[in-house]
Amino acid sequence: MIDKARRILLVAAATLPLMASHAWAAGLISIIVTDPANPYWLTEGQVAKATAESLGYTANVSAHKGDTNTESTMIDTAITNKSVAIILDPANADGSIGAVKKAIAANIPVFLVNAEINQDGLAKAQLVSNNAQGAAIGAQQWVEAIGDKGNYVELFGNPADNNAATRSNGYETVLTQYSDLKKVGKEVANWDRTQGYQKMQSLLQAHPDIVGVISGNDEMALGAIAALKEAGKLSQVKVGGFDGSPDAVAAVKAGEMQYTVLQPVAVFSAEAVKQADKFIKTGSTGAASEKQLFDCALITKDNVDKYTGPFTLSQ
């Protein structure tokens, strides 16, 4: 009996290195986001990492903060660390192409999330929100809030990010249908709350009679709300956002923001990792196309209670 027990223990001990080797064999997935100080990008990284780990990979998250040189260095690190895949939120539609090419030259597949690059056929997949659709539903909701006449201003995101122009153009397509709505100012605030606050202060000084602010993302919108509060104007000016961040949802619930457009970042961040896993194992992502659009949803005071977690809206 003792000999039998010893043999079982020896067999079990012998299999441990094999089990450890098998677990390690899945490899490292490197995740590169823009800036986790923004809850949107924080969620992007957290969801991608958790999904990778649930599939048996190790994963790390780093941030380039919109700087292509930093991004390039992080790609170098991913190559040095022998990553089996890279999940990248690109810093620049044109400027990130070289970094993606560098990873591909090292035989590491790249999966882009949230933003596109201006070259097809490099990344294995580009998974992004349907920004045009999101902008359209947001702009229509904004018109319902402010009415069909009056002066308004726009806060624009990072010009190096195609999403900024796509959303702005989507707003324009809807709002130009209302001839008595006049855009009297537009400022670049680079997706940033502090810049949104500062630009809103300047816009208010130049255009004190505005009735609305339409923003390319929630952080800029929240900055605008802070400036409007400070000026005692929030009750007169309606603000709309885009992202579906927890702070924006709280502002909608408080009646300070009219709506936010929810980007399904939690969905496509997880999906990018799943497609990376499938590609690693089969040589195919399983998707019908490289560029994949994920529809956005509107969050208003009528459905805000269905917000069940960061960037998650129950049906």
Give the label of every model feature segment.
Residues L10-S21:
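Bacterial N-terminal signal peptides
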Residues M1-L10:
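Bacterial N-terminal signal peptides that target proteins for export
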Residues K4, A23-Q315:
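A residue-level marker of the well-folded mature domains of exported/periplasmic proteins
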